[in-house]
């Protein structure tokens, strides 16, 4: 069941759902708008011949922070990682779905490639997978509305929420745009 604005406010007031910093004006009829943080991860495409999800490639991306009052310019065809300004904390009976803002989609900005789902129990800044599919550069301003977080109530609390030792949560507590840790999904045969 998708939470309404009144349910979202009630969950935040009760301290079960965390959206920090919280601004009540960002609550929409069935979502909470989230804003763009000021940190980005750009790909160093001259260091590798290819991306291998099975390999740890620590210098595949570099952290970039635009100067105060300046935007990050995302060029056509580019892909970077960003993050929400808000730290989001979900209880064990709520899951989240990050959606883009339609006004930005109409300009050619995609806010996530595949990872729009947030598990119950997650706590951290949500990493954004930003792509420009337009034919002109798009300026991304820290603090701008970048997406909307929809919240869904589970039929029962998760037995092993995200962050539990049994589920191998790789991104719990993340701050800023966090690079892929897909290599942790591969078993090493030494």
Curated annotation (Swiss-Prot):
The active site is at residue 129. Pathway: Pyrimidine metabolism; dUMP biosynthesis; dUMP from dCTP: step 1/1. It is an enzyme of class 3 (hydrolase). Residues 161-190 are annotated as: Disordered. The record marks 116-117 as: Important for bifunctional activity. It catalyses: dCTP + 2 H2O = dUMP + NH4(+) + diphosphate. Keywords: Hydrolase, Nucleotide metabolism, Nucleotide-binding. Pfam families: DCD. GO terms for biological process: dUMP biosynthetic process; dUTP biosynthetic process; nucleobase-containing small molecule interconversion. The keyword ATP-binding does not apply. DCTP binds at residues 101-106, 119, 127-129, 148, 162, 174. The keyword Hydrolase applies. It comes from the Bacteria. GO terms for molecular function: dCTP deaminase (dUMP-forming) activity; dCTP deaminase activity; nucleotide binding. Signal peptide: none annotated. Its EC number is 3.5.4.30. Homotrimer. Bifunctional enzyme that catalyzes both the deamination of dCTP to dUTP and the hydrolysis of dUTP to dUMP without releasing the toxic dUTP intermediate. Belongs to the dCTP deaminase family. This is dCTP deaminase, dUMP-forming. It comes from Mycolicibacterium vanbaalenii (strain DSM 7251 / JCM 13017 / BCRC 16820 / KCTC 9966 / NRRL B-24157 / PYR-1) (Mycobacterium vanbaalenii). The lineage of its organism: Bacteria, Bacillati, Actinomycetota, Actinomycetes, Mycobacteriales. The gene is dcd.
């Amino acid at each position: 069941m998708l939470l309404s604005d009144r349910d979202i406010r009630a969950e935040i007031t009760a301290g079960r759902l965390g959206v920090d910093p919280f601004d009540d004006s960002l609550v929409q009829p069935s979502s909470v708008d989230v804003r763009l943080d000021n940190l980005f991860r750009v790909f160093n495409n001259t260091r590798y011949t290819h991306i291998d999800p099975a390999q740890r490639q620590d210098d595949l991306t570099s952290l970039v922070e635009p100067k105060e009052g300046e935007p990050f310019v995302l060029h056509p065809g580019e892909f970077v990682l960003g993050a929400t300004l808000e730290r989001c904390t979900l209880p064990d009976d709520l899951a989240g779905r990050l959606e883009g803002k339609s006004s930005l989609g109409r300009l050619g900005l995609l806010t996530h490639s595949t990872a729009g789902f947030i598990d119950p129990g997650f706590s951290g800044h949500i990493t954004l997978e930003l792509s420009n599919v337009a034919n002109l550069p798009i300026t991304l301003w820290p603090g701008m509305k970048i997406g909307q977080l929809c919240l869904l109530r589970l039929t029962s609390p998760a037995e092993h929420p995200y962050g539990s030792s049994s589920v191998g949560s790789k991104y719990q507590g993340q701050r800023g745009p966090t690079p892929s840790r897909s290599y942790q999904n591969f078993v090493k045969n030494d």
